[in-house]
Amino acid sequence: MNDRGVPNSRTGPSLLALLPAANSYAAAYSPANRRAVGVGGGSYKSPTRGSPGTRGGWKAPLCLTLIGGIDGTVAALPPPAVYSLTFSGLGEPPQGAPRRGGGGADAGERTERGSTANKKKRQRGVLSPPSALGSSPAGRGRPAPAIAAAKSSPLSASAAPGRCGARPRAPSRATRERRPRGNPRAPLRRGARGRRRSHTRGPARTTVGAVEPRAGLCE
């Protein structure tokens, strides 16, 4: 550069010629104008989740910008990604943008609904308290052995009030809901005899192994 401020052809463009280009880059990639469409030469908006380089902001144009010097020389400026350290607005994610990896819980955090331990406990019937009747809801688990033995015993069946004339049936393994062997997560299925027919109008059918009430207890 000579004394008059005009750059020589050997040294290339002066710093005064680079200032307008730097100002245009700063205005184009500021946070206020980042959402505008078509800002800057060849810039385009990134996807919603962004890429590792831009983090959800504007991607830098891939082409070089040519600037004409005062004395006719031509200089090439690199893409605006070089100016990310100079201009603070470049490379920051927009306000309200989700974090990388999707929304919801943070990385490494497990929600209670998706916990595997809770699913196993529900299948075993640990989380649901046993009911007073002895049968667990929705076929989860089996009734307590003490309650099941009390229901199937002849003394308790005959001594119960209002059950003198009824014929108690012994619990059948075919009608009990069970899971197939070897697969604890298989859906519950009924026995080989099918569903219980509680809507039939005929007399009560006797089951093999039914316990008859003892004479003399219900009078």
Curated annotation (Swiss-Prot):
Low complexity bias: start-end ranges: 127-173
Recorded superkingdom: Viruses
Keyword Signal recorded: yes
Segment forming the signal sequence: 1-26
Region (Disordered): 36-57, 88-219
Biased composition (Basic residues): 176-202
Keywords: Signal
Protein name: Uncharacterized gene 1 protein
Native species: Gallid herpesvirus 2 (strain Chicken/Md5/ATCC VR-987)
Organism phylogeny: Viruses, Duplodnaviria, Heunggongvirae, Peploviricota, Herviviricetes
